[in-house]
């Protein structure tokens, strides 16, 4: 799985995911499923905001790569990935400026057009169950929830999908491609099932003579995703390195 992640995700995303895991005492070489999940979630958050701007009339427009966007405002503020203190500073500033209610938990994005925070979810499980879990945790009408699955399904608050169909299809296609590439390498089953992942991990470590002292239970603790995002990702050109640059997964 580690090789897959390094081959199939933008190197900058991989580096940031590694920093986050190491800060919380997790090893990307061992917690490889979590490594893949963090990279996937971050990529979806950036894809969600990519190309979307607000013009001088307050209208949401899509600007393709190469077109001038110097005088336009990004439609979405990326909160996910910032340092936690800075993230809350941004959230507080948005709330003070717009008058929207402050969320209980840090959301992933803020939509300047709809004036609402957005929580992005990417699930390997049944999408309705995952959505309900998110909604039960957040318990706020101020935060809009949008869930994507690896099978092309999506679910959003009040069936309001925020983005145009083409932008959402781009995200779904990327997720489906990740799933297909994992499956072709025999990685998908372990990515979906913690028990299968545990079995595969023990098998891999045993073959390397590293199984001694391994915990007997899978950790279900979720790391805060990408809180060490570099400031350079938050300026006006933060998406430049990602636009139309998703690496093609290489066969081993």
Curated annotation (Swiss-Prot):
Record-level GO BP terms: viral RNA genome replication; viral translational frameshifting
Pfam families: Flu_PA (PF00603)
Positions marked as site (Important for efficient shutoff activity and nuclear localization): 195, 198-199
GO MF annotations in UniProt: RNA binding
Free-text function comment from the UniProt entry: Plays a major role in the shutoff of the host protein expression by cleaving mRNAs probably via an endonuclease activity. This host shutoff allows the virus to escape from the host antiviral response. Hijacks host RNA splicing machinery to selectively target host RNAs containing introns for destruction. This may explain the preferential degradation of RNAs that have undergone co- or post-transcriptional processing.
Domain description: The probable endonuclease active site in the N-terminus and the basic amino acid cluster in the C-terminus are important for the shutoff activity. The C-terminus acts as a nuclear localization signal. The C-terminus is recruited to host protein complexes involved in nuclear Pol II RNA processing.
Protein name, entry field: Protein PA-X
Native organism: Influenza A virus (strain A/Swine/Wisconsin/1/1967 H1N1)
């Amino acid at each position: 799985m580690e090789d897959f992640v390094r081959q199939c995700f933008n190197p900058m995303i991989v580096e940031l995911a590694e920093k986050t895991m190491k800060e919380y005492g997790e090893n990307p070489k061992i917690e490889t499923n979590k490594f893949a999940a963090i990279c996937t979630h971050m990529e979806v958050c950036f894809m969600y905001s990519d190309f979307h701007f607000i013009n001088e009339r307050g209208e949401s427009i899509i600007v393709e790569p190469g077109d001038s966007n110097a005088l336009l405002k990004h439609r979405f503020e990326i909160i996910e990935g910032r340092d936690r203190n800075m993230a809350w500073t941004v959230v507080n500033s948005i709330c003070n400026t717009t008058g929207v209610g402050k969320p209980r938990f840090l959301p992933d994005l803020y939509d300047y057009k709809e004036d609402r925070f957005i929580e992005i979810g990417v699930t390997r499980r049944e999408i309705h169950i995952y959505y309900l879990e998110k909604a039960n945790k957040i318990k706020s009408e101020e935060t809009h929830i949008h869930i994507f699955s690896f099978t092309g399904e999506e679910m959003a608050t009040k069936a309001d999908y925020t983005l145009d169909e083409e932008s959402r299809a781009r995200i779904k296609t990327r997720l489906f491609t990740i799933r297909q590439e994992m499956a072709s390498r025999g990685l998908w089953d372990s990515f979906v099932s913690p028990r299968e992942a545990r079995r595969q991990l023990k098998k891999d470590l045993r073959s390397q003579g590293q199984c001694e002292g391994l915990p007997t239970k899978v950790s279900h603790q979720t790391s805060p995703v990408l809180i060490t995002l570099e400031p350079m990702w938050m300026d006006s050109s933060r998406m430049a390195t990602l636009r139309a640059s998703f690496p093609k997964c290489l066969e081993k």
